[in-house]
Amino acid sequence: MQDNETDGRDVPTGHAVIQGYLKTLDGSPGVYRMLDAQSQVLYVGKARNLRARVSNYARPSGHSGRIARMIRETASMMFLTTRTETEALLLEQNLIKQLKPRYNVLLRDDKSFPNILIAKDHPFPMLKKHRGKKSEKGSYFGPFASAGAVNRTLNQLQRVFLLRTCSDATFESRTRPCLLFQIKRCSAPCVGRVPAEDYAELIGDAERFLQGRTTKVQANLAEQMQAASEAMEFERAAALRDRIKALTQVQSSQGINPRGVAEADVIAVHLEGGQACVQVFFIRANQSWGNRDFFPRTGAGAEEPEILEAFLAQFYDDKEPPRMILLSHPVDNPDLVGQLLSERAGRKVTLGVPQRGEKAELVENAARNARESLARRMAESATQNRLLAGLAEAFELDAAPKRIEVYDNSHIQGTNAVGGMIVAGPEGFLKSQYRKFNIRGAAGAQGDDFGMMKEVLTRRFERLLKEDPERKTDAWPDLLLIDGGAGQVSAVQEILQELGVDDVPFIGVAKGIDRDAGKEEFHRPGEPPFALRMNDPVLYFVQRLRDEAHRWAIGAHRAKRAKAVSATPLDEIPGVGAARKRALLAHFGSAKAVARAGVPDLCAVEGISETMAQSIHDYFHGS
């Protein structure tokens, strides 16, 4: 890959600048960047033939309004040549994610999707929800559109197949069945209520169910019930009858169940008023595993094929694509996108725009959902903009804030202290930009709320000053809301003055004398506190912001506290990660038992080599 960079800051912007680059380009594939007079990237694009693509921009006419504006602002260009067009597409999407150019389509929601994992690193496999890298041993099923969709399916699997969901440590410590056994959601393998062979059969049935082979599962259960009845094992027959009934209820409660589509993502885009909604339905094993809507950033003039092509490349950047992707509109480069996705999946991925039949109905359903989601979002956005304008008026800001950061701390007498930051703006809560701060300084141990707030804001703004000192991105806040009164406001003022940040307004939100919601007092530096009318929509808006920050901080504190409670000496041993820790605890039952074990006993644990066993033994015995 070659990098040819040219700086055009001293030449005029527009067609003349672009024309000047043509003589330096050949017909190689690659990626180009268009920069403005301040060297900010306006646009990143790919090309099969760089010279041909750039010559299109050099034409004085025939461009959409969006492209014409971009050309007028272009002061310089940068080029990267690649070996193939597929490589250029991959590089283009990586640069778009990294640089976030103003004129590109950008997918803003990059959250991972949950899966169901049947973990098989234990004689009695465990059923659980899983996110992230598929590094654990077992069978994965997904993706599901949301945690709620996974939880519903897990609940169904427990009802029908009676699989355990407890941790290995809990499993090993049980001496009698838990409540899940009593309510017929688990077969209690922890205390030997089900033989290993029978439990393995339950696991097999659950896997067949998740693979869409429900008819076979139902037939197997019916055969077992008949056999139990003939053998006069009436209690077992009744239990099997209940499982068949539960399975029938599960099948009837499932929504979209396409017969002719075993595995696909159905993706539709709706474009209106310069905004876009992309709706994705996940179909696996002939079942719909939920849907998710996305609102990519698009410039005025962007069209459906461009939006879908950018979405596909960015969405599947860290997700395995299914065998088939059904689209509402054709993309500009279907062969290229299909090749890229096939390379990522390690198998053939087909793109299609169905015109009739069941597949077309699935796409139409996704398109209808995209249309309705965008209408709701536009209505919510109008309300949000009115609230932001009201906030600016109430707090005497120069303009309606586009980025509000709200801060809160959470701890119990200084233990497991955490600071939380949430972000809100015209599009509502921006959850992908929420942050947690583990309190490192003495303020946490002392339970000093003012000191904690100083630490959190110091870390936040020192990073901003380091990464974006000229404030060229939208990472800088227009308003800070702090949970607290005059003391917190003084602490914030002190730290911002020390950092030289004197133009970011901040407000302290205190609950007032009675500490009742609705009687909040607002504090600004050097001014007496003031209040808003009880029925003022802005007051409710600020309460929502404060409560969300409180929820986020408390959640972070609880997670940190839970982690501290579950910590064991095994966490301190070099080379013992999560998988080895699970294996050791499952084998020995407790960290104390691991500490007492000899090297031969440790070697008997799966994944523990003789060298690692010696290291573990030496750690506990001081050798």
From Swiss-Prot:
The listed locations are: Cytoplasm
Where is the GIY-YIG domain positioned along the sequence? 27-105
Is Metal-binding there in the keyword field? Answer: no
Q: Where does the source fall among the domains of life?
A: Bacteria
Q: Name one GO biological process term.
A: SOS response
What GO terms fall under cellular component here? cytoplasm; excinuclease repair complex
The UVR domain covers 215-250
- Write the record's keywords in alphabetical order, separated by commas: Cytoplasm, DNA damage, DNA excision, DNA repair, Excision nuclease, SOS response
* Keyword Transferase on entry: no
- Please state the protein's primary subcellular location: cytoplasm
What are the recorded GO MF terms, alphabetically?
Answer: DNA binding; excinuclease ABC activity
UniProt similarity note? Belongs to the UvrC family.
Say what the protein does.
The UvrABC repair system catalyzes the recognition and processing of DNA lesions. UvrC both incises the 5' and 3' sides of the lesion. The N-terminal half is responsible for the 3' incision and the C-terminal half is responsible for the 5' incision.
Q: How does it assemble?
A: Interacts with UvrB in an incision complex.
Q: What is this protein called?
A: UvrABC system protein C
